[in-house]
């Protein structure tokens, strides 16, 4: 029954030194985390500022697109009534296509 037991002195635990706690490392880590928190706060502020700028640009673009889309429709309705008297303006059509 006792054949599986090792004879002689027991080997020392290899992980003995690695398992010891170092309390000084925790004290050194605290300033790093506070600096990281400050960096994260600054990054969040920058992201919020950029997001607000993009929202404003999107609103302006939507407003601009609506005004452009309404103007050609109003201009096209009037010339359709007098289509026979006026030739087609290719330059104006090219400019409108470029705006799209």
UniProtKB/Swiss-Prot annotation:
Disulfide bonds: none annotated. InterPro entries: RBIS (IPR031389). Its main location: nucleus. It is found in: Nucleus, Nucleolus. GO terms for biological process: ribosome biogenesis. Keywords: Acetylation, Nucleus, Phosphoprotein. GO terms for cellular component: cytosol; nucleolus; nucleoplasm. It comes from the Eukaryota. The keyword DNA damage does not apply. The modification N6-acetyllysine is found at residue 21. The modification Phosphoserine is found at residues 19, 69. PANTHER family: RIBOSOMAL BIOGENESIS FACTOR. Trans-acting factor in ribosome biogenesis required for efficient 40S and 60S subunit production. Associates with the pre-60S ribosomal particles. This is Ribosomal biogenesis factor. It comes from Homo sapiens (Human). The gene is RBIS.
């Amino acid at each position: 029954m006792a054949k599986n037991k090792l004879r002689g002195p027991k080997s020392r635990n290899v992980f003995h030194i690695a398992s010891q706690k170092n309390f000084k490392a925790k004290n050194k880590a605290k300033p790093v985390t506070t600096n990281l928190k400050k960096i994260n706060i600054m990054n969040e502020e920058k992201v919020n500022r950029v997001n607000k700028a993009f929202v404003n640009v999107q609103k302006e673009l939507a407003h601009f697109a609506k005004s452009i889309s309404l103007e050609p429709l109003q201009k096209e309705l009037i010339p359709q009534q007098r289509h026979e008297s006026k030739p087609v303006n290719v330059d104006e059509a090219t400019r409108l296509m470029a705006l799209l």
